[in-house]
Amino acid sequence: MLGCLFLLAALPVQAQSTDSPAATFSANASLTSQYISRGFRQTWGKPALQAGADYAHPSGWSLGTWASTVSDRYIQDATVEWDLYGGYSGTVAELGYSVLAYYYKYPGAVYRATGVKYDYGELSLGLSYKMLYAKYNHTVTPDFFGITHARGTGYLDVGANVDLGNAWTLNLHAGNGRVAGTGNAIWNWRDAKVGVTRAFDGGWSASAAVTRAWGATDAYDHYTLGIPNAAGQFDTSNPAAATLVVAISKTF
């Protein structure tokens, strides 16, 4: 997976004529009330700092990285999620498409009960048409987010970003996750989000959303890593519960 990203980075950059579009580099930063990924609260209900950077070549190839703070109550021994991604995207008439590789890294994080790291890699196929989009992510590494022998796990993400006018956008999302591997189906889930984003001058934006996930079983209802805290109690939570998330972001 990382090899794919390094190959993309090694692509030759050809001189552009004055009429050719130039490659673009952008960066972003956010402060959010909590980090929600695929319906789950990654920061145990606490705020998160997030930042990323993207490079896009006019040929359609791109590379990027993104990071967020996370909670070690949800991801054992983790404080940061660090993503690397790259691939190709383009359009045919009004239909957009993308083929991307992702690698999600959680430095120092290991689920101690099994010795499995939380790091994993995915291939992603995406389509978009006007305000609609659909994306399917397929796990290509042996393990998925601390779950062993889960190669082939899939996540379907569909939604719409509806222009409401006056710089407002309605954000709609539904997701469906299926965890591969013997006995791993207890971690299957669905999730949904309804939110709005308001764009401002200077690359600023503000957003608010309500999210919720539903487990196929009660495995998420009293989630714990099984390690006593200083008081000798187990930290438990339902990371899939409905929650409101607000954020302010800046694009550079």
Q: Which residues does each predicted region cover?
A:
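Cleavable N-terminal export/targeting peptides
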Residues: 1-24, 252
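Short glycine/proline- and aromatic-enriched beta-strand/turn motifs that initiate or cap beta-hairpins
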Residues: 16-71, 243-245, 249
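Structural signature of outer-membrane beta-barrel channels/translocons
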Residues: 18, 54-58, 89-93, 126-132, ...
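Residues that define the transmembrane beta-barrel architecture of outer-membrane proteins
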Residues: 23, 45-49, 78-82, 95, ...
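Repeated loop/turn-to-beta-strand initiation elements of outer-membrane beta-barrel proteins
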Residues: 25, 59-65, 93-99, 131-136, ...
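Transmembrane beta-strands of outer-membrane beta-barrel pores
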Residues: 31-37, 67-71, 90, 103-107, ...
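Detector for outer-membrane/organellar transmembrane beta-barrel domains
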Residues: 118-191, 210-211, 251
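Outer-membrane beta-barrel "beta-signal"
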Residues: 194-204, 235-252
